[in-house]
């Protein structure tokens, strides 16, 4: 809505305080506002058809006459009558002062409509929205250019050049707007600001290179979508700054943007207007965001003098400047600490904004201490955290690490000053509020993506704190200075001891930011309002409290810096804190569900065991333990969402710790390459202990631990020290085990001495084997370290992140939730399964470079280290307590692989929490010695879902089994995203009974007392045959009425593109632009392949196909081909994960998108038969009655239909809608349930077109006869009606029929067929009305015997035609001109001579539209230059379609002539573009009834003969004017 105020010289407004009273201008009135430029008084543009607000003069304070007006605080009367509304200051209000002293104030959605106002705009939000609008317009221009370029004619060449100039100008304007936008205030998370700004600048360069210089590269059109994405990210921020006054500011809920229709109370209007933002530089305020502004306080009644004005920044006045972060001082082995002075000029709203910036270069560091800046703001109950920037910049040639930490935050609570200078003038302590909104980003997926950003930052901060604490420990234990100080001053405070330590200071500041971000994270998670998120957030808050309590011992001064955090979280006293901490520590050590400890924590407890009496070591160790628990719990919330069993001990398998709906955090909006958790691979050198300490956050072995991308020498030394201690521990454990074995009771005396000697020999052999295995392990570890160092160099160049670890994907509890299960409650599918997002990671570890070292990946799991050395095979089904005698006492011997891992008989049926991919590969290699490909374990229900043949025949076996089954390794990655195993191995776990079976589907894997008795066998069929068979089976699940696979048409899968054989292109010389070439003619399969191509998104091609497919196929065949395309198999033996990610998934999404467009445009295609509403055959009804239902017209049969096996089958086919529903339900298991629900909702959203309600005929005889009509309506009645009224009501009737014309009526010349009334009712209605009105014009003139009356009637018809021209009703205009130019009327020269010259000129001007030269060039030029609404002459389009149909073949060389369909679509598209915008004319029943009773002349030839005879009687040939005038009536 546009709001306009205008003023004049006598009453000029200086401030908005004076603009108080508004009234609405009457609706439907045109308001023309002229903005003048310079002295030329040149009009720039007009604003018309607006509902504006008129400004009243000022009124005296005493003029309150009780007329609904109220007096505000300043004594200015506010008129509240006539529905007055007030400005919403949260919208973009622009003030423009022109040369004629005219003020323009507007509330607008974007600036594309008013480019001249851009120079006056200072609101970042509307600049951004305008920029997005410009990008959308550029995309439209680009598509128009491509269309013009494809149709090379002389006229299109001129249009192409003109449009190309406009397009390049738009590119330049876009570049300027984007750069101006990036200069605005910081509206985003600082941690991602640099990457976003850098990406936007890079995209601008690419766009300018691809689209401005040289030819247009249509392949790079995705650059604009990427630019939109980054601009939207740039704008996101939680608004929490409220006006700097005591006014009641009403804000919307967190999921809704502020509505322009909200009405502020009159009492608050003055305060709102007085706080109107002044135009200032964006850099003057640190808290500008997209929804609210920092307002200058111009209210004289408010005594709260804030210093945070836009033009006078308090940060500069008080010399409290925040130190910059770019301090690269080259100091030599010195630690320079600069403390800036604090000027305590605290106002009533003073808050401490801490900013500490550290630039670390090797051992030289510069620490800039925080300063206090007084910024006057109030923080409402929403997070406004400029999240901490913790970016690691690594140089591979040196050990230089730059860490910048900035903490400038407003947090979750109302912030008030804690100083003693709080005056009574501060009225900001009780500001009512609602939850602010995400202005531009309201979609849940975007919120979730931003929550993930915060989560990543929290994990990064945990990692940094951990590294700095390790450095602190190394320094404390190795530096003699600290050792001496600690011995001399046992009671010395920790903060005093480490006050000059860089690691200590940085860790403290990062921890402050971590606490803030965790609160922000929890609050945002609660806003998502998913299942169990609120309960989970409470648990996480408790974990945060425990971390805070334990950290207070290490950082005693931390509470001084947390005055603007939610302090109610930390209200417990120190006694309760100590008790809670102790209890928590005890529970974590005694409760089996919490016995999992961090690798770092366990190592520290052993490495510093000699220093247990040292309180500092214990304190740091305690903080590290709590930090690991903290990061682990956060990771569980955002990562482990589907039946997580990673943090639960084997004794508590029945407990559920997951929240299935929380899977949105990983699968709702992220792709496979999106960073979710930090995976550190092959980062450090040393033993297996060092590598095991760097695991993913969702690892099942222990709580989370991190490492930085590069290590400082001190941290590397500590890791090496820990590795040595671990080796010593292992040796001590071996000695203890030997001592325990010696203490065991002696063997039974009845045992012979020979058997005893044999046992001793076996023990010695086993010990030798163990030593050999240890040596082999050490060699493998050394090789692994070398490969890790090489891979780490590549990782440092391009960090690799994965959304979840491969281990967590395979370790799946059988009792948990199922992947991709349809939610039966709301009939919608759950979000995409988590494991689908990790196919890339799994395949990289199995088939890529890392897959070559898959046998050595066991070292990455800390829980497997003890198994390597001691053979502790502790599984759920078989617990062996003795370490070296297990093999002798148990009959189930453990088979040892080459890597030294042992597995008992139960390890193949149940996955433990420490199982890794390398372990599974080793198990498979031992179980199937004849197979060269390792096998993997998979839960039975997971395998059960993907194997459909086995699904039907052995459903009862798999459903009753809870054990895991073995699948072939080759299947991994080929089916995880699609449910499509290329070579499914139906291996059936038996219930403890060995044997074989499976009905020829493979060898059965039976687990009994004898261990593994069976192996795996692959099928004899080839890979391509299995893929094709699976596609056929998937298709037959939808088309379940097919009884044989032979009835399935597989041509779309087998037919390959062969140029000049099954497809012909127009520009076939341009090989580089192959995917964007226009098809001239092709087979139906090739057209479907082009329609759903994975690498192309030609929307125009899609619309052309959907619009014209009826001319060469049927809806049943079209839907069948799309479904077959969805189940496209991998017949070219492409690498499976590449096929899934780059081919299969894009094709499936293209298919669903085509279905969506099809249903949106033509929902009637899915009805049997499609119904077309019309009024042509209805009796004329009263305005209060509804139209009667029409008989269902039959769909015209297309001229070309391809025969398929599906059509030739004798089985009765189900309806099209039923097949569509069955297919959409089948897509849910692939994670496309949300898309399917969206498509199905399109049917419910379809609305019937609004038709004009016509008055009923009194005589009830239907279409009247000619004689009755002429007798009923006299000449006086026609003269009594206004020419404009007749033209307007005729326009309403014509547009009602025109807007109802459907595409099916324009295909195959259906309007010229015998059944045109049923097939093309709306076209028939327009044609009949055209002929009726033309006949009415001729007969109304010729029925007047008096020449004067006849001349007057002719003038009346000319006026009606001219009124039709002014309304842009060219169809009615040409109908009236046809009647005036009929042979019987055209020859009445004496009658024409009585018409004035003025109307004769108008008539001659209108007759130019009838010029048929150059294919109606005059008419086409005028109609193309006219803006809608308009009604074109339908006859010309029907003529064009007839020429296209008759002049072009349907088939060429047996292929579909698609070029002909494009020509048809272009004509139909031009017809449709005028159907969108209608007329705003009120119907008049009396005139409508008169026009509806116009007689229909069935015999046009006879009517023309009758009118010509009547014309001869009125004006005989060779008669004079006088004779005609004297003739008798």
From Swiss-Prot:
Domain Ras-GEF positions: 1282-1517
Annotated spans, Disordered: 290-357, 576-600, 680-724, 847-948, 1168-1206
SUPFAM superfamilies assigned: Ras GEF
MF (Gene Ontology): guanyl-nucleotide exchange factor activity
Primary localization: cytoplasm
Location of the N-terminal Ras-GEF domain: 1075-1205
Biased composition (Low complexity): 576-591, 683-724, 853-887, 906-916, 924-940, 1168-1187, 1197-1206
Family annotation (CDD domains): RasGEF (cd00155), REM (cd06224)
SMART domains reported for this sequence: RasGEF, RasGEFN
Keywords recorded for this protein, A-Z: Coiled coil, Cytoplasm, Endocytosis, Guanine-nucleotide releasing factor, Phagocytosis
Job of this protein: Promotes the exchange of Ras-bound GDP by GTP. Involved in phagocytosis, fluid-phase endocytosis, regulation of macropinocytosis and control of cell movement.
Protein name stated in the entry: Ras guanine nucleotide exchange factor B
Organism: Dictyostelium discoideum
């Amino acid at each position: 809505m546009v709001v306009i105020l205008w003023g004049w010289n006598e009453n000029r407004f200086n401030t908005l305080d004076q603009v108080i009273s508004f009234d609405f201008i009457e609706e439907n009135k045109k308001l023309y506002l002229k903005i003048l430029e310079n002295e030329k008084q040149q009009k720039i543009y007009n604003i018309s058809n607006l509902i504006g607000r008129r400004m009243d003069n000022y009124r005296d304070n005493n003029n309150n006459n009780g007329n609904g007006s109220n007096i505000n605080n300043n004594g200015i009367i506010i008129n509240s009558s006539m529905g007055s509304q007030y400005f919403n200051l949260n919208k973009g209000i622009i003030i423009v002062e022109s040369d004629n002293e005219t003020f323009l104030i507007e509330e607008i959605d974007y600036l594309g409509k008013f480019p001249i106002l851009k120079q006056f705009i200072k609101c970042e939000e509307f600049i951004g929205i305008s920029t997005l609008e410009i990008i959308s317009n550029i995309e439209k221009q680009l598509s128009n250019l491509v269309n013009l370029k494809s149709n090379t004619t002389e006229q299109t060449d001129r249009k192409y050049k003109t449009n190309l100039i406009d397009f390049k100008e738009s590119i330049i304007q876009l570049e300027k707007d984007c750069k101006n936008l990036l200069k605005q205030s910081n509206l985003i998370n600082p941690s991602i600001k640099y990457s976003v700004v850098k990406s936007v600048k890079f995209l601008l360069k690419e766009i300018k290179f691809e689209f401005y210089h040289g030819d247009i590269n249509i392949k790079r059109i995705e650059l604009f979508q990427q630019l939109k994405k980054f601009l939207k990210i740039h704008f996101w921020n939680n608004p929490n700054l409220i006006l700097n006054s005591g006014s009641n500011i009403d804000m919307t809920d967190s999921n809704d943007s502020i509505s322009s229709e909200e009405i502020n109370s009159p009492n608050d209007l003055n305060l709102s207007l007085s706080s109107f933002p002044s135009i200032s530089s964006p850099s003057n305020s640190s808290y500008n965001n997209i929804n609210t502004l920092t307002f200058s306080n111009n209210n004289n009644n408010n005594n709260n003098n804030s210093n945070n004005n836009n033009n006078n920044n308090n940060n500069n006045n008080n010399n409290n400047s925040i130190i910059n972060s770019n301090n690269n001082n080259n100091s030599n082995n010195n630690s320079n600490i600069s403390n800036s002075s604090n000027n305590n000029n605290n106002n009533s709203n003073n808050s401490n904004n801490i900013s500490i910036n550290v630039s670390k270069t090797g051992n030289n560091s510069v620490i800039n201490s925080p300063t206090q800046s007084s910024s006057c703001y109030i923080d409402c109950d929403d997070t406004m955290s400029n999240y901490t920037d913790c970016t690691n910049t690594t140089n591979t040639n040196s050990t230089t690490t730059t860490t910048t930490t900035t903490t400038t935050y407003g947090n979750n609570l109302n912030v008030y000053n804690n100083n003693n200078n709080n005056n009574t003038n501060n009225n900001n302590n009780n500001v009512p509020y609602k939850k602010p909104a995400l202005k531009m980003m309201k979609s849940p997926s975007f919120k979730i993506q931003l929550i993930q950003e915060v989560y990543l930052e929290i994990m990064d901060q945990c990692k940094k704190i951990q590294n700095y604490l390790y450095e602190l420990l190394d320094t404390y234990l190795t530096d003699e200075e600290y050792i001496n100080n600690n011995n001399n001053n046992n009671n010395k405070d920790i903060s005093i001891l480490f006050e000059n330590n860089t690691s200590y200071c940085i860790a403290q500041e990062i921890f402050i930011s971590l606490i803030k971000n965790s609160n922000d994270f929890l609050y945002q998670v609660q806003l998502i309002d998913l299942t169990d998120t609120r309960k989970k957030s409470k648990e996480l808050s408790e974990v945060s409290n425990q971390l805070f309590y334990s950290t207070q011992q290490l950082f005693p001064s931390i509470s001084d810096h947390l005055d603007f955090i939610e302090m109610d979280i930390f209200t417990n006293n120190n006694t309760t804190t100590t008790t809670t901490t102790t209890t928590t520590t005890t529970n974590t050590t005694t409760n089996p569900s919490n016995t999992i400890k961090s690798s770092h924590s366990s190592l520290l407890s052993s490495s510093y065991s000699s220093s247990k009496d040292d309180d500092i070591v214990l304190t740091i160790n305690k903080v590290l333990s709590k930090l690991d628990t903290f990061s682990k719990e956060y990771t569980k919330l955002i990562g482990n969402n589907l039946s997580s069993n990673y943090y639960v001990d084997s004794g508590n398998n029945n407990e559920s710790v997951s929240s299935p709906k929380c899977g949105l955090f990983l699968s709702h909006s992220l792709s496979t390459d999106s960073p979710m958790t930090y995976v550190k691979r092959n980062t450090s050198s040393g033993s297996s202990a060092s590598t095991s300490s760097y695991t993913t956050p969702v690892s099942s072995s222990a709580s989370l631990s991190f490492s930085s991308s590069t290590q400082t020498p001190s941290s590397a030394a500590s890791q090496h020290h820990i590795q040595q201690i671990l080796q010593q521990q292992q040796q001590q454990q071996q000695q203890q085990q030997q001592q325990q074995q010696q203490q065991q009771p002696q063997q039974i005396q009845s045992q012979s001495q020979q058997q005893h000697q044999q046992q001793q020999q076996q023990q010695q052999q086993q010990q030798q084997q163990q030593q050999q295995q240890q040596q082999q392990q050490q060699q493998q570890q050394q090789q692994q370290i070398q490969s890790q160092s090489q891979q780490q160099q590549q990782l440092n160049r391009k960090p690799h992140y994965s959304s979840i670890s491969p281990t967590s994907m395979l370790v799946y509890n059988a009792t948990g939730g199922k992947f991709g299960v349809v939610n039966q409650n709301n009939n919608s599918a759950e979000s995409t399964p988590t494991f689908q997002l990790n196919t890339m990671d799994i395949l990289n570890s199995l088939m890529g470079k890392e897959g070559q070292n898959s046998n050595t990946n066991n070292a990455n799991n800390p829980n497997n280290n003890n198994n390597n050395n001691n053979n502790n095979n502790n599984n759920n089904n078989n617990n062996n307590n003795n370490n070296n005698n297990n093999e002798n006492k148990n009959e189930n011997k453990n088979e040892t692989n080459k890597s030294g891992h042992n597995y008992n008989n139960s390890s193949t049926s149940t996955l433990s929490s420490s199982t890794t991919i390398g372990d599974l590969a080793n198990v498979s290699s031992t179980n199937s010695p004849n197979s060269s490909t390792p096998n993997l374990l998979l839960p039975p229900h997971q395998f059960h879902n993907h194997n459909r043949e086995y699904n039907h025949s052995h459903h009862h076996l798999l459903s009753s089994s809870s054990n895991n089954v073995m699948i072939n390794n080759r299947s991994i990655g080929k089916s995880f995203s699609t449910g499509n195993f290329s070579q499914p191995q139906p291996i059936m776990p038996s219930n403890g009974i060995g044997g074989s079976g499976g009905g020829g589907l493979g060898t059965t894997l039976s687990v009994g007392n004898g261990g593994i008795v069976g192996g795996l066998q692959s099928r004899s069929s080839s890979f391509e045959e299995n893929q094709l068979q699976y596609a056929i089976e998937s298709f037959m699940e939808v088309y379940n009425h097919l009884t044989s696979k032979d009835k399935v048409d597989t041509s779309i899968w087998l037919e390959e593109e062969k140029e000049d054989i099954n497809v012909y292109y127009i520009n076939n010389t341009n090989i580089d632009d192959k995917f964007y070439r226009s098809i001239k003619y092709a087979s139906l399969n090739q057209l479907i392949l082009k329609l759903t191509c994975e690498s192309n998104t030609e929307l125009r091609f899609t619309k052309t196909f959907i619009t014209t497919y009826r001319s060469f196929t049927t809806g049943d065949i079209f839907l069948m081909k799309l479904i077959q395309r969805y189940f496209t198999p991998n017949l070219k033996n492409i690498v499976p994960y590449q096929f899934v990610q780059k081919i299969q998934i894009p094709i499936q999404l293209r298919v669903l998108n085509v279905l969506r467009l099809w249903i949106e445009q033509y929902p009637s295609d899915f009805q049997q038969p499609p119904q077309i509403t019309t009024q042509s055959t209805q009796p004329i009804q009263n305005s209060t009655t509804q139209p009667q239902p029409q008989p269902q017209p039959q769909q015209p049969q297309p001229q070309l239909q391809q025969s398929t096996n599906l059509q030739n089958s004798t089985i009765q086919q189900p309806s099209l809608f039923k097949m569509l529903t069955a297919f959409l339900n089948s897509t849910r298991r692939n994670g496309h349930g949300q898309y399917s629900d969206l498509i199905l909702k399109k049917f419910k959203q379809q609305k019937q077109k609004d038709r004009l309600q016509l008055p009923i005929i009194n005589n009830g005889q239907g279409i009247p006869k000619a004689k009755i009509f002429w007798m009923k309506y006299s000449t006086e009645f026609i003269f009594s009606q206004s020419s404009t009224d007749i033209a307007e009501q005729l326009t309403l009737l014509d547009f009602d029929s025109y807007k109802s014309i459907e595409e099916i009526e324009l295909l195959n010349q259906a309007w010229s067929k015998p059944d045109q009334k049923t097939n093309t009712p709306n076209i028939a209605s327009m044609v009949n009305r055209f002929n009726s009105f033309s006949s009415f014009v001729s007969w109304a003139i010729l029925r007047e015997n008096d020449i004067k009356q006849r001349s007057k009637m002719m003038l009346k018809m000319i006026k009606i035609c001219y009124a039709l021209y002014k309304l842009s009703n060219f169809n009615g205009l040409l109908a009236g001109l046809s009647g005036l130019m009929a042979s019987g009327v055209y020859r009445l020269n004496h009658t024409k001579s009585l018409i004035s010259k003025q109307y004769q000129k108008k008539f001659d001007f209108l007759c130019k539209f009838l010029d048929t030269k150059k294919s109606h060039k005059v008419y086409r030029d005028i109609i193309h230059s006219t803006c809608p609404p308009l009604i074109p002459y339908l006859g010309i389009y029907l003529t064009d379609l007839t020429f296209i149909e008759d002049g072009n073949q349907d088939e060429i060389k047996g292929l579909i002539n698609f070029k002909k369909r494009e020509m048809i679509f272009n004509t139909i598209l031009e017809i449709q573009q005028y159907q969108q915008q209608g007329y705003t004319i009120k119907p008049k029943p009396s005139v409508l009834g008169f026009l509806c009773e116009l007689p229909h002349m069935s015999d046009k030839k006879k009517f023309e003969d009758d009118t010509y005879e009547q014309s001869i009687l009125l004006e005989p040939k060779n008669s004079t004017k006088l004779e005609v005038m004297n003739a008798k009536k």
